[in-house]
Amino acid sequence: MENVLIIRYGEIMLKGDNKSFFEAKLTKHIRGAVKDLGDVKVYKMHSRVYIDVEDFNADEIIERVKKVFGVVCISPAVRFPVDFDVIKETALNQIKEEMAQRGVKTFKVESKRVDKKFPLKSPEMSREIGGYILENTEGLEVDVHNPEVRVYVEVRECSFVFTKKVYGFGGLPLGTNGKALLLLSGGIDSPVAGWLVAKRGVEIHGMHFHSYPFTSERAKEKVVDLAKILTTYCGRIKLYSVNLLAIQKEINEKCPEEEMTILSRRFMMKIAERVANKIGCDALVTGESIGQVASQTVKGLHVTNAAVELPVFRPLIAMDKVDIMDLARKIDTYETSILPFEDCCTVFLPKRPVTQPRLEKILRSEALLDVEGLIESAIGDMEVERISLDDE
């Protein structure tokens, strides 16, 4: 008998002639997630990925693999040659383990006969295995509707028996849908937005705007910490840090106070687009949500969009704040995001920011500034950092 992990994927199965491309990407990313653990054998067979875990910590591997986009669920299983007596005994042993560990009193057997040469059909297998379990245990009942534990039996080229399914995040393998630049602040929203877009197979890099020395070094470090958390899902990330202070001072000196936020936002988008084009990104990603703050009204978003030509992905656009917070907790960015450090949006914050900006009026104000010079200067002083999970 061998201990293996069965890794299943979902949407990849619908990719038709491109399926093998997506499968290869997924297998590559799974290998990458466990490569530092040693010579872990990862391989694809019959529209699944398998990992041999006989000599490894299966729980640690599961924790890593479930964060790989494209993985729907993982089952730690026992694999052995097809022998129905061994199948029954293995199923019984796994049920006894569940009874000892969790005190379960109800169960169900779910069988799947993939190898049609096997003489018993799936329902017959389930009945015989269930009967064998009942004969050899006490205080256990069958519950086909809501069992405390399910015993899964599969007969393929060999037999698999397991009781657990650990769910991943699904989605598509990273790098199968282009590349995007995430405007990464230190808040709750933007890391979640980046994670959601990455889940659809988009490679993510980050751009952070700060107003140092009006904002602190620790505020910048917080963003690096968020980027490191994202690397557990997204792999290595390039983080571009841009000081917006000179631009904010110019806006504060020459433009109406209430337009500070929307004008600053347009500069951020212009700078992000300029860098995105240079590094081969096909889109920008932001954590904006309709009505959440003054610059995120529909008119505000229209004025912001008008600053760039690249598509802007806003995966949080219709989400409530509480739902965004729940997802941030799920992906482990929440506790870092709520650390009380200032960001560039708090510098020169207007008392009454415009909530219904008109594009033509904003363009007139923008014409008072040396837009091109300010952008070039900001990009010229930009810092680039390569972030990976291994960074200390």
Swiss-Prot record:
Entry keyword annotation includes ATP-binding: yes
The reaction(s) this protein catalyses: [ThiI sulfur-carrier protein]-S-sulfanyl-L-cysteine + a uridine in tRNA + 2 reduced [2Fe-2S]-[ferredoxin] + ATP + H(+) = [ThiI sulfur-carrier protein]-L-cysteine + a 4-thiouridine in tRNA + 2 oxidized [2Fe-2S]-[ferredoxin] + AMP + diphosphate; [ThiS sulfur-carrier protein]-C-terminal Gly-Gly-AMP + S-sulfanyl-L-cysteinyl-[cysteine desulfurase] + AH2 = [ThiS sulfur-carrier protein]-C-terminal-Gly-aminoethanethioate + L-cysteinyl-[cysteine desulfurase] + A + AMP + 2 H(+)
GO BP annotation list: thiamine biosynthetic process; thiamine diphosphate biosynthetic process; thiazole biosynthetic process; tRNA 4-thiouridine biosynthesis
Domain THUMP: residue ranges: 59-166
Residue positions binding ATP: 183-184, 208-209, 265, 287, 296
Subcellular location field: Cytoplasm
Keyword flag Cytoplasm: yes
Enzyme class name: transferase
InterPro entries assigned: Rossmann-like_a/b/a_fold, ThiI_AANH, ThiI_fer, ThiI_N, THUMP_dom, THUMP_ThiI, tRNA_STrfase, tRNA_sulfurtransferase_ThiI
Pfam families: ThiI (PF02568), ThiI_fer (PF22025), THUMP (PF02926)
UniProt EC number: 2.8.1.4
Signal peptide coordinates: none
Predominant localisation class: cytoplasm
GO MF terms held by the record: ATP binding; CCA tRNA nucleotidyltransferase activity; tRNA binding; tRNA-uracil-4 sulfurtransferase activity
Entry similarity comment: Belongs to the ThiI family.
Listed name of the protein: Probable tRNA sulfurtransferase
Name of the gene: thiI
